[in-house]
Amino acid sequence: MTETAEIHIRVVNYRGAQLSAVYGLIDLFGTASAMGADEASDMHRRIQAGTLSPPYTALPDPPDVLILPPSLTSRCGPDEADASLTDLLLTQHQRGGLICSICAGAFHLGRTGLLNGRHATTHWALADQFRMANPEVRLDPDKLIVDDGDIITAGGVMAWLDLGLRLVDRYLGSAIMTQTARFFLVDPAEREQRYYSGFIPRLTHGDGAILKTQRWLQSHFAEKVSIPDLS
C-alpha cells in the first residue's frame, strides 16, 4: 500500500505581490505532484499548495513552506512594513518551517532580521536599495538562488520558476523536477543574474565631485573620453 505524505506550501499574497508568480507557483507544484503520482514508489509525496492573504493571523495548520513572491510595484520601503506579516515569518522560522523569498519579497524577509549575517539575493536592480535597508545582510545579487537551508532567497522577477523547481527537487526528487522543467519548457540548469543585469552606477554616495563626473559621462558616453576630460 502506498503511503502519501503531504508537503504544505503557502504563497503569501501580500499587497502588490505579482499574481502571475503567486498562481504560477501553485500551478507548477500541482503539475509536479501529478507527475509524482504516476511514479511507482513505496512512498509518494505530494505538494499541497495554496495562497495566504492578509490579515495574517496564527495559522491553525502551519505550512511546511512559506513563499514571499516578487512584486512589480515599488512598494518595498518602510511604509509597506506589515507587523502581522513580520510576526508570521518569525513564527514560521521559530517552528522550523522553511521561508523563501523572490525578488522584492526579500524586503519583507529582511525586516524580520532573519537574514542578518547570512547570504541572500534579490533582484539585481534592487541591490543598492536592499543594502541600504539591510546593511547586515551579505547580499549577492549575482546569484539567482541562495539556498541557506531554512531560508531560500531568489533573485529576479521570473526566478519564481527557479525557486519552484528547487522546492520540487527538495521534496519530490530530481526526476520529478526534471520532468516538471521539461513540461514547462524551463532550463533547470543553474543560472546567474549577472548575465542579465545592466550597469547602473550608484548616484547617492554623497561625493559631489564624483557625481559631477558621473553626470558628465552619462551625457558623453558615445564620445571618446580621456583622463583630462574628466579632470
Q: Residue ranges of each PLM-predicted region?
A:
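Active-site-adjacent pocket-lining segments in enzyme domains
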Residues: 3-16, 52-229
